[in-house]
């Protein structure tokens, strides 16, 4: 038997499809999401409706975004879900979640078992719409969840950690073994809750500057920041900001990265003479 076939659908590698089939895990995720009637629930990648059905049972209306044409068609003709669904057959990376929130008339509650091959870029795409999002619940590769929640001075801490924690409170929910899927992925999975900050703990004047600093620092994470960020900050400026120039990217806190970004937004890049 082909273990890539589930409910008559062949899982497509190019879409990173792994279908959730463990009822205990499904119930645990739906309980964590706790969908309520009247909320603007949006599912990314509903697949074979493992989460769509139990969530949809609690709602009068549900928006889903599904790239796979065949799966979108199955949902359209679903016996009890069909009439409740608004289906966008497109790549979630091209979705304007701000416009969707305006159309529905309230902040979105986004959830999904995300394809692991696009999970990180999709997270960054969603971060740009946090003003339009109430919360997010995602099944991700466990390693990605570890990176999302990681703090400074750990190997998992990186650009994704900084940017996620800048935008959101990040809360791990549960771990999921490969056996909960068809076909089983080669990695462990985990569910995470992301709640956009209503008041930013570390306000930044220009998010593009924070993005640039974290990219440059973590692209050379083994270098000290006096070297990796030497084109942006002099040793004197780092010292003035209370940041040791001998630290590496993984030693700098989210608050310190935001402090550096605000300095750079207000001052032209300076170098040690």
UniProtKB/Swiss-Prot annotation:
It catalyses: adenosine(1518)/adenosine(1519) in 16S rRNA + 4 S-adenosyl-L-methionine = N(6)-dimethyladenosine(1518)/N(6)-dimethyladenosine(1519) in 16S rRNA + 4 S-adenosyl-L-homocysteine + 4 H(+). Its EC number is 2.1.1.182. GO terms for molecular function: 16S rRNA (adenine(1518)-N(6)/adenine(1519)-N(6))-dimethyltransferase activity; RNA binding. It is found in: Cytoplasm. GO terms for cellular component: cytosol. The keyword Methyltransferase applies. Its main location: cytoplasm. InterPro entries: KsgA/Erm (IPR001737), rRNA_Ade_diMease-like_C (IPR023165), rRNA_Ade_Mease_Trfase_CS (IPR020596), rRNA_Ade_methylase_Trfase_N (IPR020598), rRNA_adenine_dimethylase (IPR011530), SAM-dependent_MTases_sf (IPR029063). It comes from the Bacteria. Keywords: Cytoplasm, Methyltransferase, RNA-binding, rRNA processing, S-adenosyl-L-methionine, Transferase. S-adenosyl-L-methionine binds at residues 18, 20, 45, 66, 91, 113. This is Ribosomal RNA small subunit methyltransferase A. It comes from Citrobacter koseri (strain ATCC BAA-895 / CDC 4225-83 / SGSC4696). The gene is rsmA.
């Amino acid at each position: 038997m082909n273990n890539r076939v589930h409910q008559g659908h062949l899982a497509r590698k190019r879409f990173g499809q792994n279908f959730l089939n463990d009822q205990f895990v499904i119930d645990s995720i739906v309980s964590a999401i706790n969908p309520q009637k009247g909320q603007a629930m949006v599912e990314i990648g509903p697949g074979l409706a493992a989460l769509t059905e139990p969530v949809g049972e609690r709602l009068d209306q549900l928006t889903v975004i599904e790239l796979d044409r065949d799966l979108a068609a199955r949902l359209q003709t679903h016996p009890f879900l069909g009439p409740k669904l608004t289906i966008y057959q497109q790549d979630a990376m091209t979705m304007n979640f701000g416009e969707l929130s305006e159309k529905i008339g309230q902040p979105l509650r986004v959830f999904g078992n995300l394809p692991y091959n696009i999970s990180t870029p999709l997270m960054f795409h969603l971060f740009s719409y946090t003003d339009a999002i109430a919360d997010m619940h995602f099944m991700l590769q466990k390693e990605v969840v570890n990176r999302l929640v990681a703090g400074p001075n750990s190997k998992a801490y990186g650009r994704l950690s900084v940017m996620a924690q800048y935008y959101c409170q990040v809360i791990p929910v549960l771990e999921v073994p490969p056996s909960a899927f068809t076909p089983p992925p080669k990695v462990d999975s985990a569910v995470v809750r992301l709640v956009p900050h209503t008041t930013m703990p570390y306000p930044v004047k220009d998010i593009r500057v924070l993005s640039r600093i974290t990219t440059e620092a973590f692209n050379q994470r083994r270098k000290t920041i006096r070297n990796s960020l030497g084109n942006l900050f002099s040793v004197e400026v780092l010292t003035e900001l209370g940041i040791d120039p001998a630290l590496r990217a993984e030693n700098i806190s989210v608050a310190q990265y935001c402090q550096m970004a605000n300095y750079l937004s207000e001052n032209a890049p300076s170098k040690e003479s």
